[in-house]
Amino acid sequence: MALPIIDVPTFDLKVPGIKEKIKFRPFLVKENKILTLAAASEVIEDMYSACCQVIENCSFGELNSKDLAMYQIQWIFIRLRSKSIGDTQSFILSCGKCENKINYDMNLSDFEIVGDYETSEKKIELSETTGIVLKYPSAEVQIKKDQLDDIELLLNSISYIYQDEEIVTPEEETIEEMLEFVSNLPLSVLNESAEFFQNIPTLLHKVDYECTECGTKNEILINGYDHFFG
């Protein structure tokens, strides 16, 4: 006989920073395998790639992970995990003084976006008629942020350049032309962009806990790929 086709439930999510609602489905066995292999590698790039693959699969291809900022990847992944596996995740926390291990069960809905995701662009005027508009760097760029210098980060965060009514996007120019353009910008642009990058939204949950052995009060911020897998 023909193997049955299993109906999979779908649900809509209003992703922060995206106007339209996106339709998703929960993880399937194949996505769980992708995540398990990534978790076993303990390599942050593998975890990022796994999240991106799962998000693209579960959004029926509506989302391109390369267009998403890190906080959006994290936010979507947590919602997918809640719908697929459950609303809670167990962590083992350590005491900063005696290193005693403490079990902690977290409700994933306790994650909060810290930062202004509504203002996802910054306009920097170079003259009365000319300027650049920055966007939050994609997750793909942000995950390599520590490996990029200020010029490279700025280069990868330009949404478009305008002069009077004309608009030019980085995709219309060669990487060499864009690099030369950025290298010749006033130093004040780097300062303004640095302030913008400092306010990139992130997903965080602060946990205050007391050690069951020595009574020391501890605090930890749970965020990002360091804590997503487990």
Predicted regions: what they are:
Residues M1-G230:
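Long C-terminal interaction/binding lobes of large macromolecular proteins
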